[in-house]
């Protein structure tokens, strides 16, 4: 047997064996086994996997293999999030059809993922661009339409001028499109919406049940849903255009109404738009606000800008007082009513605006400990020169009937007065807005509706689903090819039979990924779901993916599951019982003398006089070693998994990804780390294959007695097994790797001299291989076979640690003299006090420390410490 492990031969061999045996094909009726559903967020078929994929899917694979060995019926499927703009971009840039480009990429990536050795049930594979899949998605949409969960209305939208499509608020990052990076514009379009806001309370309350989700993700969703208790207040308007007699605002601080010094409208408030029709200067101001950006981040960092409309709003409590009405760039149309009253003394944005436009600052809340002259100084200082708004707790001042009340009491009293006067009411507001799902592009799921001039907007009859995308489209012009297709969009009205037209918008691709995990439970069902199977398999027990999806995909999926429950497709509320967000894969960056990025594969690094020096392999030109950053195509600091697999094997890549750092943290890919992982595979192989004569034959009964050395090895093996089992349960893969190293060292240091020792070494090696199995499955199978097993490791049950071997017979305790540590003592765990005392006093270093002085007393803390007082 070769002493060198050949990954290139072993890995395809075992992948073929697993496939032929059907080891990972999941059966719905698995003889009463408990179910376990593990799923990694499915990939976009870009054409090549990257190291982030390797890390993500390796983690899920470890769980799947471990749970299978533990006796679970494991569902571990794979599919493709296949619609989206990159395919259309490829069509325009490379003159290829999005469909062909996508399916070619899927074929390539499928082979790459198989090369990693994933325990995937490929029989359940689908792509979201399969008509079979998106036809069921269209049926779900029609179900939601019938249930009143869909609306169509005009709205201001985020328009990506590069991708020529609408973006949801969550897809606008720092004022730019999440995919194209283009500055987003605001336009009014008729859009389709899913009523996620109907589920705002449910989505918020459900977060409390997700105790296996990262707290950070739950907090991000909580903030995005944004439940706020406050008041609706109606300000009467003076000199307003016809029909605009009242201005409705929402505030969380009705207690500060006496501090109001102006009102402000969003640039996209209906009143603003009405005023702008006859005001070119206001129109220009709105355009400038749009140019700056629409996101909260962009608004937060931009200079505060305002436009005085000339309108006045009457104060609801102070007779005769009016407030100027501005249009302000920091007021969001998507929050509240798109209009605010501003209290500069107690809101920083309001204060910044007031100082810029010389508006009054009226303090109406003061700290409770401010009295008399100190209170006067606080109020006057804030009003006249203060640059920091006071946002703390306190009591109301300068507020008539509210004076002296704490903030919460003042809020309630203000709301009571508003309601009594009929000019306001207490209410709850949500930041969450309905989900705009219309996209003006070709490569997406067609929205199954028909527009008829006589009958209006109608659903496509269900017997005509799926509405399939046409293949004969032209990408030579910008915009949506479906709009200009000569025949596809022209249909007869299903109600009156007259000529009508199809909806040419397609779904936001996040719709596709909001229910795919349900379809995996019955991918061949003739309806969107097989409810019995969905109820059996869901929720997903462990979901794995990046934290960048905390709001978008994860929130949409939680909503979609509830909408599917409301339409009778599933019985649960929460789709993912456990969520794990893995860290990113990083690498050093490299630049040449001109500042151009250089890929790692083109760089050679040497250590010269203790310093790392880099040069380009092709021409020897010096290369600058830059910072360690997330692997990205833009900075060319990527490592191709195919190159790593070709050089070292998939197991090496998997091992390094699991071993280098905790899985929730970023990992830095280094050549040295990969080399170290590869060396361990060779060491493991040698440990198993060399000196097999030292091992007891397979199936040897356990001896009745062992020597102390043999027991020490057995304890090491069973303690490693118990610890690794707990590590796998808690997704602490790097710790499981550490257990493997510890046990490998224990096995390497043991040479058996008896049949009992031969048994102990075989037992330890088999446990070692079984712990390695979920993480490096190919070499584990080779080792298992070399150890004489006829069945593959995938068929073996997870070993059970012997509890008797998890407790050490001896214990090491510190020995102090007058509180200062002098030595340590290893002694039987059950030794009595007198035995411990005698052994401690007999230690040479302790004797020197006592130096003949009389011992006054000996304090023994069993199993921990001995303190000798002299």
UniProtKB/Swiss-Prot annotation:
Any one annotated GO CC term: cytosol
Subcellular location: Cytoplasm
Binding site for ATP: 633
SUPFAM superfamilies in the cross-refs: Anticodon-binding domain of a subclass of class I aminoacyl-tRNA synthetases (SSF47323), Nucleotidylyl transferase (SSF52374), ValRS/IleRS/LeuRS editing domain (SSF50677)
Residue numbers covered by motif 'KMSKS' region: 630-634
Main localisation: cytoplasm
EC number: 6.1.1.4
Catalytic reaction equation(s): tRNA(Leu) + L-leucine + ATP = L-leucyl-tRNA(Leu) + AMP + diphosphate
Top-level EC class: ligase
GO molecular function, one term: aminoacyl-tRNA deacylase activity
Segments carrying motif 'HIGH' region: 43-53
Superkingdom assignment: Bacteria
Gene3D superfamilies with a match to the protein in the record: 2.20.28.290, 3.10.20.590, HUPs, Isoleucyl-tRNA Synthetase, Domain 1, Valyl/Leucyl/Isoleucyl-tRNA synthetase, editing domain
Matching PROSITE patterns: AA_TRNA_LIGASE_I
Cystine connections: none
Any one biological process term the GO annotation gives: leucyl-tRNA aminoacylation
The entry's keywords: Aminoacyl-tRNA synthetase, ATP-binding, Cytoplasm, Ligase, Nucleotide-binding, Protein biosynthesis
Entry keyword annotation includes Phosphoprotein: no
Family assignment from sequence similarity: Belongs to the class-I aminoacyl-tRNA synthetase family.
Name of the protein described by the UniProt record: Leucine--tRNA ligase
Organism for this UniProt entry: Parvibaculum lavamentivorans (strain DS-1 / DSM 13023 / NCIMB 13966)
Lineage: Bacteria, Pseudomonadati, Pseudomonadota, Alphaproteobacteria, Hyphomicrobiales
Gene name linked to the record: leuS
């Amino acid at each position: 047997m070769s002493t060198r492990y050949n990954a290139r031969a072993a890995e395809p061999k075992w992948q073929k064996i697993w496939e032929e045996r059907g080891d990972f094909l999941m059966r719905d009726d698995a003889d009463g086994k408990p179910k376990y559903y593990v799923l990694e967020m499915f990939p976009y078929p870009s054409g090549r996997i990257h190291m982030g994929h390797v890390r993500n899917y390796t983690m899920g694979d470890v769980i799947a293999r471990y749970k299978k060995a533990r006796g679970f019926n494991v569902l571990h499927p794979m599919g493709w999030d296949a619609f989206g703009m990159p395919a259309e971009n490829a069509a325009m840039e490379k003159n290829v059809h999005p469909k062909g480009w996508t399916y070619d990429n899927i074929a390539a990536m499928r082979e790459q993922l198989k090369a990693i050795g994933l325990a995937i049930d490929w029989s359940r594979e689908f792509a979201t661009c399969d008509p079979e899949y998106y036809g069921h998605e269209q049926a779900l949409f029609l179900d939601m339409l019938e249930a009143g969960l869909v609306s169509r209305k005009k709205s201001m939208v985020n328009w990506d001028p590069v991708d020529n499509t609408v973006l949801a608020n969550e897809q606008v990052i720092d004022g730019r499109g999440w995919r194209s990076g283009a500055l987003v514009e605001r336009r009014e379009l008729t859009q389709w919406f899913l009523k996620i806001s109907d589920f705002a309370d449910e989505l918020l309350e459900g977060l409390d049940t997700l105790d296996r989700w990262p707290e950070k993700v739950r907090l991000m969703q909580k903030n995005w849903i944004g439940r706020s208790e406050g008041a609706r207040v109606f300000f009467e308007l003076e000199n307003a255009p016809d029909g605009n007699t009242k201005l409705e605002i929402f505030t969380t601080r009705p207690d500060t109404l006496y501090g109001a010094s102006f009102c402000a409208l969003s640039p996209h408030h209906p009143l603003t738009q009405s005023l702008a029709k006859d005001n070119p200067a206001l129109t220009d101001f709105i355009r400038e606000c749009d140019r700056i950006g629409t996101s909260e981040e962009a608004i937060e960092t931009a200079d505060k800008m305002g436009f005085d409309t000339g309108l006045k709003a009457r104060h609801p409590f102070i007779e005769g007082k009016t407030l100027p009405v501005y249009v302000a760039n920091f007021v969001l149309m998507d929050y509240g009513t798109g209009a605010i009253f501003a209290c500069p003394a107690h809101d920083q944005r309001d204060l910044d605006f007031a100082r810029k436009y010389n508006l009054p600052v009226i303090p109406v809340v003061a700290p409770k400990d401010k009295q008399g002259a100190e209170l006067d100084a606080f109020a006057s200082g804030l009003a006249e020169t203060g640059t920091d708004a006071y946002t703390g707790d306190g009591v109301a001042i300068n507020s008539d009937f509210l004076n002296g009340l704490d903030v919460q009491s003042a809020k309630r009293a203000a709301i009571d007065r508003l309601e009594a006067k009929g000019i306001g009411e207490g209410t709850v507001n949500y930041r969450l807005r309905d989900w705009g799902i219309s996209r003006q592009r070709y490569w997406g799921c067609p929205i199954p509706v028909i527009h008829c001039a006589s009958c209006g907007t109608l659903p496509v009859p269900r017997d005509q689903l799926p509405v399939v995308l046409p293949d004969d489209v032209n990408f030579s012009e910008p915009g949506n090819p479906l709009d200009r297709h000569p025949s596809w969009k022209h249909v007869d009205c299903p109600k009156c039979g007259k000529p009508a037209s199809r909806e040419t918008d397609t779904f936001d691709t996040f719709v596709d990924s909001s229910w795919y995990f349900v379809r995996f439970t019955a991918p061949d069902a003739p309806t969107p779901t097989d409810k019995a199977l969905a109820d059996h398999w869901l929720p997903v027990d462990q979901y794995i993916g990046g934290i960048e999806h905390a709001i978008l995909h994860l929130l949409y999926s939680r909503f979609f599951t509830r909408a599917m429950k409301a339409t009778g497709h599933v019985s649960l509320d929460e789709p993912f019982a456990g969520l794990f967000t893995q860290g990113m894969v990083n690498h050093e960056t490299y630049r040449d003398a001109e500042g151009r990025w250089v890929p790692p594969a083109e760089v050679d690094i040497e250590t010269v006089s203790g310093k790392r020096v880099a040069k380009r392999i092709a021409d020897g030109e010096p290369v600058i070693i830059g910072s360690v950053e997330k692997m990205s195509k833009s900075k060319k600091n990527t490592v191709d998994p195919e190159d790593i697999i070709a050089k070292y094997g998939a197991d090496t890549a998997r091992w390094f990804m699991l071993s280098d750092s905790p899985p929730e943290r970023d990992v830095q890919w280094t050549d040295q780390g990969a080399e170290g992982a590869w060396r361990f595979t060779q060491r493991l192989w040698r440990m198993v294959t060399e000196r097999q004569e030292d091992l007891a034959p397979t199936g040897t009964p356990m001896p009745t007695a062992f020597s102390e050395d043999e027991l020490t090895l057995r304890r090491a093996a069973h303690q490693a097994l118990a610890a690794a089992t707990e590590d796998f349960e808690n997704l602490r893969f790097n710790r499981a790797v550490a257990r493997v190293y510890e046990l490998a060292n224990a096995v390497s240091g043991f040479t058996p001299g008896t049949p009992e020792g031969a048994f102990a070494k075989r037992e330890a090696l088999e446990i070692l291989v079984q712990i390695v199995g979920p993480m490096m499955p190919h070499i584990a199978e080779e080792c298992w076979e070399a150890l004489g097993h006829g069945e593959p490791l995938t068929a073996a049950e997870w070993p059970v640690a012997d509890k008797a071997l998890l407790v050490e017979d001896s214990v090491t305790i510190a020995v102090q003299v007058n509180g200062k540590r002098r030595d340590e003592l290893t002694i039987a765990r059950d030794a009595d006090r007198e035995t411990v005392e005698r052994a401690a006093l007999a230690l040479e270093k302790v004797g020197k420390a006592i130096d003949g002085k009389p011992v006054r007393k000996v304090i023994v803390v069993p199993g921990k410490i001995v303190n000798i007082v002299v």
